[in-house]
Amino acid sequence: MNRLPEIFPVLVLAFCGLTTACATSSQPVDPYVQKLQWLDAADPQADANQAVKKNDLRLLGLATRSVNIPGISKADTLKYEEHCGVQLIEGISDVVRSDEHLRLMQKARSYALKYNAIIKSQCKP
């Protein structure tokens, strides 16, 4: 009772599936994109409310050519930086590395605007 002829097609398919999966996953992910992927599942309102509960009133900033704090005017940036503090979102750059990086940087800006609106209501210079 040799079962090899019955199992052989299954083994071949499994081997092909494993080698294909390995081949497609070998492409490196841009580290800037990797640092921003959390934004796809993030909830800025919930995250900001959690930060307020922990008394972490730092605003979120974007490090491009200079630090930009979404929702804060350039004139007020220094006051808010000194009084509330700023936490930079990692993965932001003044160089767009790919379409995916651009999409995530735009999402980071939108996230920071919503997050900072809540924090700003709690931290006034």
What residue ranges belong to the model's regions?
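Post-signal/leader-peptide non-cytosolic segments of secretory proteins
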Residues: Q27-P125
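Bacterial signal peptide processing site
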Residues: A23-S25
